[in-house]
A protein has these predicted regions:
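Charge-enriched, short contiguous segments at helix-coil
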Residues: 79-138
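Amphipathic alpha-helical interface elements
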Residues: 2-73, 81-88
Length: 138
């Protein structure tokens, strides 16, 4: 697929793109559909959607009983899915979808889009790292 944001798909963030088919074959039906929707969001720079779907995908991968997850030990699963970065991503997603107070990127300022783009770049980097760790352990 072709992506439009150079920042989101910089050299550090090409893992998901370069390994799309490999990743997709290890996902269950729920995760696979979310992964497809995520790639569509990346194509069109839908920053909020990228953040929301990336965090959701991490949770689905952890809980959808696929052969790759079933092959991991409890320690490996905790190590991968309970990292500081994964927690940041979940908290960021939750602050978007469960409004409690204004957050960076959604304040109505002219810098909002830049902040959301930066969050999206970080998000894709986190998801790529998690997917890479899972695939290395298979």
């Amino acid at each position: 697929f072709k992506l439009s944001s150079k920042k989101i798909t910089n050299s550090k963030n090409t893992f998901l793109i370069n390994n799309y088919i490999e990743i997709k074959k290890y996902l269950g039906p729920h995760g696979s559909h979310i992964f497809y929707e995520l790639t569509e969001a990346i194509k069109y720079n839908n920053y909020l959607t990228i953040i929301i779907l990336s965090a959701t995908l991490i949770d689905v991968i952890k809980n959808e009983k696929t052969s790759i997850i079933n092959s991991l030990s409890g320690v490996e699963i905790n190590s991968i899915f309970s990292s500081y970065e994964a927690m940041w991503l979940r908290q960021t997603r939750n602050s978007i979808v469960h409004y409690e107070k204004p957050i960076d990127g959604l304040l109505g300022n002219k810098e909002d889009n830049k902040i959301l783009e930066e969050y999206s770049v970080k998000t894709i980097s986190i998801l790529s790292k998690i997917m890479n760790e899972i695939l290395k352990l298979k």
